[in-house]
Amino acid sequence: MEPIQKMDSLNNKEGQPDKKRKKHESEKEGENEVLEIDVTKPVPPSKKLMRKLRKAGKIDKDGNWTPEALEEAKKKEEKRLKRLDAKYGRKEEGESQEESKRSPWGIWVGNLSFHTTKEILTDFFVRETSEMIKEVSEENIKPITTEQITRIHMPMSKEKRFQNKGFAYVDFATEDALKLALQCSEKALNGRNILIKSNTDFSGRPSKPANTLSKTASIQSSKKEPSSILFVGNLDFETTDADLKEHFGQVGQIRRVRLMTFEDTGKCKGFGFVDFPDIDTCMKAMELGHNSWRLEYGEDRSKRMRNKSPMARSGRFNDAESLGQEDKPNFKRARKIDPRSVRPGAALAKAQRSSAAIVEPAGQKIKFD
């Protein structure tokens, strides 16, 4: 038996390897290696996306973009940049900086046709000023040229495409060109007599109402009586409790800040309440004020009363007006009940019930005739 066991052990060593074999040196080295990822590089596309792109013919078998796909992506990027230029009014590369600059000699042009363009307006000033000088026959004065018009700003309508809003701003390079342009007012352009005013002429504007009330007078003109609660309105949606505490903390201690917020976003609804420990501190906060916030005294809950009837407010017998008022009958009409809707047995449900127990004998004999 011993030689057979020795042969088995030799077969395990030389022939077939044991189950618990040693790992290869390359596997040990692979375990010690660390995978490095470059965060700056773009994320590689997934296998699903690569299959879609390969079926669409945008990439080849090696995963490289085809020339047709690159040309299509370039056109899309150009369209996107054009939309941004149209939306935010970005200047094109070929446009000179002199055309985009404002000058001190500018005019406002109103009552324009909605289909008037910048080119039509430029031709109008060149044509009208040249005809004006021919009529006067003065050699010293020169008409307006396209080079003297440095800027034309014509706001476009958002609702209707390719239509202006009916007015424009034009800047000139010289003061003489400005004077000639002002003389073109009330002249026809596209069937309308346009109006031209200098950018420094503010006549015709309604005068702003002068606020002659001081802070004290404005506080006294408040409809509500002073209280320890201050209502703050016209707040920005990004306003927080810390902003109110920082502003009103200058006058003294703040008991509580109640900022009304939306349930879904948690942002401010535009108003809130600030509670102070006393009325004097609240009045100081009212005098402090704010440039954009609307401040008003709040209503104290402890002093809040429900609206009562005039008889309950004034007293029934002491007020002459309450005596003249007739008392209205306070009764309710009986509810009509359909006898067909009454449940069986409900009619006798409230009837007096007699006891079914044995009656105790009282010593009297009952006779039946």
Swiss-Prot record:
GO biological process, one term: rRNA processing
Biased composition (Low complexity): 346-357
Region (Disordered) residue spans: 1-77, 200-219, 304-369
Main location: nucleus
Record InterPro entries: Nop13/Rnp24_RRM1, Nop13/Rnp24_RRM2, Nucleotide-bd_a/b_plait_sf, RBD_domain_sf, RRM_dom
PROSITE patterns in the cross-refs: RRM
UniProt biased composition (Polar residues): 209-219
Compartment(s): Nucleus
The keyword Transport appears for this protein: no
RRM domain segment(s): 105-206, 228-310
Domain of life: Eukaryota
This protein's UniProt keywords: Nucleus, Repeat, RNA-binding
Basic and acidic residues compositional bias, start-end: 325-341
A cellular component annotation (GO) from this entry: cytoplasmic stress granule
Keyword Repeat appears in the UniProt entry: yes
Annotated Gene3D superfamilies: 3.30.70.330
Protein name from the UniProt record: RNA-binding protein rnp24
Organism for this UniProt entry: Schizosaccharomyces pombe (strain 972 / ATCC 24843)
Gene that this polypeptide is encoded by: rnp24
